[in-house]
C-alpha cells in the first residue's frame, strides 16, 4: 500500500497523517539569461552536471531560450533581489505579435527581435533562502500539457516539437518548459525507474489549445513520454500499462482497498479502464 500511495492519484483513500524527512535550511542563487538554444542543447550534459537545478524555456518560432541556473550559496551571503516581475509582459508580447497577424512574416520577425534584444541584457540574479528563490507567482491563466520522456531523449523530442510548430505554422508564443529530474522508485511517478526530462507546452486560457496540443502529443508518445497526472493528456489504461512497470500492481492495490470504487470519479475510472470519461 505504501508504494502505491506515494503517488495514489487520490484513489486509495484519505491520508490523515504524513511524516516528511527534511534537510537543513539552505540558500540558493538563481541566474536567468536569454541564450541561443542550439548552444544550450549542445552543452546539455555539462549544464546538468554543473548546476543543482537547470531548466530553460524555449521560445517557439525563434532560436532562443530563457535559461535558469540555480545553485546553493553560503547562507551568510548578501541577499540579492531580482526586482519585481511584470506579470503583463507576456500579454504585451502576444498583443504585439497578434497585431501583425495580417503580416505573419513581419510578426514573427518582430517577435524574434524582441527575444534577441533580451539576450543582449545582463543576467538577472536573485538569491536568498531556498523557499524565496524556488517559488514563483503564476498570474497568467493557461492550459498545459506536460510529458516526461527518458532523459537522453529530451533534446531530440524538443527539437521535433519546435520543428512541428514551424512546419504546421502554429501561432503560439508561450515558451516551452524543459527540465530534468532524477529517477525514483515510486510506482506511478513520471520518473519511476528512469531519469526524466519533463517538457511542457502551454497555451493562454482564452485561446484554443486543442489543435496545438493534438499536433504535439504524438511526439511525446514517440519518445515514450509519461503524462503529468494533473495536466491535459489523452492516454488511457492500455498506454499506462506499457509505460509503468508497476501499473498492474497499482490496480491490484486499488481494487483491494476500495473494491466499490467510492474514491473514483469519472476521470479516474477512465484511467483505470473502468469506464468513465477521459476529461477530469
Q: What residue ranges belong to the model's regions?
A:
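Noncatalytic alpha-helical scaffold of FAD-dependent oxidoreductases
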Residues: 1-280
